[in-house]
C-alpha cells in the first residue's frame, strides 16, 4: 500500500531530509597515496579523494572519520569510515554515486546506514595489519608494491618464537619521537594476535592490535626477522 501525505503548507526541502550516519568499508591501493590523512601541502591522500567525491555528490563539505590512518604506500582491504549528512539517499545510492566519482585505486566495498552514535575510530574493536615478504633470490616486478623483497634465509621457527614476546600489552614509548603527534596521549598498545604463515616463497604476517603507532608494524616484523 502506498500512502501519500498532502500538506497545504510549503515544504522546506532541507527540513524534510533527515540526518543519516553512513558507514563505509573501503579497499584501496596505497601506492600512489601519501597516506590516509589530508596533508596541508596538498599531496594526494585517500581522505582527500573521498572528501572530494562527497563534495561532488552532496554539494557541501563532509567530514569523514576513519577507523585509523594508513601511512604512505600502505594498502587497505577493509578500512572503515563514517560520515553524517542530511540526505534522502539510501546506502546503495551512496555507493553507486561515490564509485562514479572516485579514482580506480579506491573501491567502496560496502555502505550501511548505522546509528548516529557510531564512530569509526572510537567503535573500532581491533585493527589488523598484514605484512607480506617475498623470500627468494629475485624480486617481483608485478608484486613490488605489495610486498617486501627479502632474499636471505628466514628462520620461521625462531620468528614465531620471537612473535610471542610481543603479545599482550606493551609500552612502545621508544616510537614516541617518530610519532609525536599520535603518541601524545598513550604509547601503550595491546597486541592481540600475530599469525605467521608461509606458502611457497611468500611469508605472510598478520598483526592484530587495538591500535598502532607510526610504522610500528614494520619495526615488529624487523625485530622478528633478526
Located regions from the model:
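Structured-RNA-binding interfaces characteristic of tRNA pseudouridine synthases
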Residues: 2-226
Amino acid at each position: 500500500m502506498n500512502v501519500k501525505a498532502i500538506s497545504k503548507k510549503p515544504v522546506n526541502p532541507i527540513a524534510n531530509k533527515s540526518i543519516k550516519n553512513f558507514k563505509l568499508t573501503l579497499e584501496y591501493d596505497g601506492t600512489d597515496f601519501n597516506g590516509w590523512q589530508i596533508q596541508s601541502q596538498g599531496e594526494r591522500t585517500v581522505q582527500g579523494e573521498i572528501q572530494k567525491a562527497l563534495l561532488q555528490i552532496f554539494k557541501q563539505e563532509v567530514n569523514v572519520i576513519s577507523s585509523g590512518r594508513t601511512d604512505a604506500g600502505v594498502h587497505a582491504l577493509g578500512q572503515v569510515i563514517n560520515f553524517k549528512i542530511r540526505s534522502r539517499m539510501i546506502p546503495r545510492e551512496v555507493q553507486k554515486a561515490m564509485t562514479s566519482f572516485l579514482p580506480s585505486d579506491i573501491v567502496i566495498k560496502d555502505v550501511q546506514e548505522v546509528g548516529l552514535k557510531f564512530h569509526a575510530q572510537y567503535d573500532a574493536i581491533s585493527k589488523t595489519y598484514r605484512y607480506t615478504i617475498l623470500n627468494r633470490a629475485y624480486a617481483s616486478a608485478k608484486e613490488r608494491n605489495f610486498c617486501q623483497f627479502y632474499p636471505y634465509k628466514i628462520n620461521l621457527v625462531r620468528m614465531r618464537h620471537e612473535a610471542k614476546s610481543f603479545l599482550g600489552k606493551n609500552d612502545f614509548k621508544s616510537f614516541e619521537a617518530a610519532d609525536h603527534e599520535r603518541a601524545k596521549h598513550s604509547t601503550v598498545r595491546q597486541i592481540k594476535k600475530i599469525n605467521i604463515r608461509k606458502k611457497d616463497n611468500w611469508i605472510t604476517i598478520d598483526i592484530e592490535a587495538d591500535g598502532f603507532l607510526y610504522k610500528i608494524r614494520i619495526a615488529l616484523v624487523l625485530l622478528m626477522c633478526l
